[in-house]
Amino acid sequence: MKAFLFSFCYNILYTVGWLVTLPSYLLKQKRRGGFGTGLLERFGLYRVSYNREPKGVLYVHAVSVGEVVLALKFLRAWLRERGGSAVLATSTATGHATAVSAQIPGVRVIYAPFDLLGLPGRCFDRFEPEAIVLVEAELWPNFARAAKVRGIPMAMINARMSARSESRYRAFKSVSYTHLTLPTN
């Protein structure tokens, strides 16, 4: 019941907040060059060419330019050691441009879906990731729930969390973070 109530309230508040800020978001995206394909991808709508993507990819979620730079280093090392392919999801036009310009073979760069109910799941159904790596400690409830429902393990890199924040995450772990390990150290 607690998880349902949290999810219900979160989705109402997030959707209302999203609708209120949408005009300024669209203006900002247009100015920064992320308006075209990026907006469709934020709704989980991908170009036809993505239909040919291999399934079972590593999904790396990096929001800003700094996180993308770290994610690119991680992906180069991961793919050199293990091979395969990956999806790098970014949230900003500048982060997206940085990721695209790196041109790492086997890495598809997409815009991360909004955390609106159903959109993260649509993305995961499209790319069928084997695992998700979050750069930094940015957790979105619908994103985490969609991963949990699909049995996709999640890990964080470069995440620092205070004891206070950790206790808050653990207090809400019944909501959607039960499959995310929060190591101490």
Place the predicted regions along the sequence by residue.
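A transmembrane-helix-recognition feature enriched in membrane-embedded lipid enzymes
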Residues: 2-39, 175
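N-terminal signal-anchor transmembrane helix
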Residues: 23-84, 88-100
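Short gly/ser/thr-rich secondary-structure transition/capping motifs
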Residues: 37-44, 113-115, 136, 166-170
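Membrane-embedded segments
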Residues: 66-143
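Short, hinge-like loop/turn segments at secondary-structure boundaries
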Residues: 104-107, 127, 150-152, 172-175
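Nucleotide-sugar donor phosphate/pyrophosphate-binding loop at the beta->alpha transition
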Residues: 115-121, 160-177
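Active-site proximal beta-strand in glycosyltransferases
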Residues: 131, 147-160
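Conserved small/polar residues in nucleotide/adenosyl-binding loops
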Residues: 178-184
